[in-house]
């Protein structure tokens, strides 16, 4: 299932600007925080975004209790999608996609806890230039540690 990419209008209507209303904080400055009505730093939950200086959308993503969690989308300054990441508490999780500025796919990977388990990288003509299509024994161990059974997954890197 393909993630729904929000329009700029949806992002601006439902999110908050990271640069204006959020900051890094919490333990080890690893959380995204905001101030509550008492002026106290609290972990942020919701949709956050950043804009380029010309007002174009640079990034949007979902934050849960201060951590990037769920879909995060990055854009080139021309408005085309640069990268689509799914995250779990700030780590890459599931399918990750990166695009060339012309919109063609640059790479696609499957990640668990931030580690690339499988991937394909393409050149600008669409030719595969590097790939890892089978998990290693270590990948199976890492996946099991995180509760993922790689032997039952049907992962399509397209």
Tell me the role of every PLM-derived stretch.
Residues 1-158:
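Glycine/tyrosine- and acidic-biased, solvent-exposed loop/turn segments at the edges of beta-strands
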């Amino acid at each position: 299932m393909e993630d729904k990419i929000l329009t700029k209008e949806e992002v601006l209507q439902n999110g908050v600007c990271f640069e204006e209303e959020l900051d890094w904080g919490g333990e080890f400055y690893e959380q995204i925080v905001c101030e509550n009505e008492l002026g106290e730093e609290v972990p942020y939950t919701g949709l956050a975004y950043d804009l380029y200086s010309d007002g174009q959308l640079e990034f949007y993503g979902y934050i849960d209790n201060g951590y990037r969690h769920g879909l995060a989308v990055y854009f080139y300054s021309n408005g085309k999608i640069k990268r689509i990441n799914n995250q779990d508490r700030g780590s890459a999780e599931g399918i990750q996609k990166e695009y060339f500025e012309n919109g063609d796919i640059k790479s696609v990977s499957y990640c668990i806890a931030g580690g690339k388990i499988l991937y394909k990288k393409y050149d600008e003509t669409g030719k595969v230039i590097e790939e890892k299509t089978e998990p290693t024994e270590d990948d199976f161990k890492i996946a099991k540690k995180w509760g993922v059974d790689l032997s039952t997954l049907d992962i399509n890197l397209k």
